[in-house]
Amino acid sequence: MSEIKLIVGLGNPGDKYADTRHNAGEWLIDRLSRRFNFTLKDEAKFFGKTARTVIDGHEIRFLVPATFMNLSGKAIGALASFYRIRPEEILLAHDELDLPPGTVKIKQGGGHGGHNGLKDTIAQLGNNKNFYRLRIGIGHPGDRNLVTSYVLGKPSPADWALIDKALDEAVVCVEILLKDGITKATNRLNGFKA
């Protein structure tokens, strides 16, 4: 396994979207910033907010794209290219319709499953799908015609309580991943349910 060098949190910019399900990846970066005491700063050349810190001897970069979701690959591609970070050294946190609230999973590779942030990231990384995904369950509205309004809506209080617990567990798992590797982090998440 390659060492993770970049952790990305997907979301849409602006206060209007801050509390929407589509910003689950950004919620994780916010928690990681509090846990590891780093501050994101705007960096125009990377089309987003970035930070760098050292965790357990590993230099890690963080990125929250300032672009809308469907263009987030532009930021990821720019930063990865500049620092020569390979796709398999990237952990991308995003909302996942196919997992219920309170669930979080790690996987490597795969398609975009209709997620525009993943779709653009794959394209901007030269069609390389080999990055890791930290999939934060938000549930599904039950009808694909309702997906857009669902991901751009706020979770119910009950769903938020489950997502909140899953985000706390994700922070612990990022620490495990950086210290002990992807397998231990994945195994822990496989046994987790909020």
Swiss-Prot record:
GO terms for biological process: protein quality control for misfolded or incompletely synthesized proteins; rescue of stalled ribosome. The record marks D95 as: Stabilizes the basic form of H active site to accept a proton. One of its GO terms (molecular function) is peptidyl-tRNA hydrolase activity. It comes from Actinobacillus succinogenes (strain ATCC 55618 / DSM 22257 / CCUG 43843 / 130Z). The active site is at H22 (proton acceptor). The keyword Cytoplasm applies. The record marks N12 as: Discriminates between blocked and unblocked aminoacyl-tRNA. HAMAP family: Pept_tRNA_hydro_bact. It holds the Pfam family Pept_tRNA_hydro. It catalyses: an N-acyl-L-alpha-aminoacyl-tRNA + H2O = an N-acyl-L-amino acid + a tRNA + H(+). CDD domains: PTH. Hydrolyzes ribosome-free peptidyl-tRNAs (with 1 or more amino acids incorporated), which drop off the ribosome during protein synthesis, or as a result of ribosome stalling. Belongs to the PTH family. Its main location: cytoplasm. This is Peptidyl-tRNA hydrolase. The lineage of its organism: Bacteria, Pseudomonadati, Pseudomonadota, Gammaproteobacteria, Pasteurellales. GO terms for cellular component: cytoplasm. It comes from the Bacteria. Monomer. TRNA binds at Y17, F68, N70, N116. The keyword Cytoplasm applies.
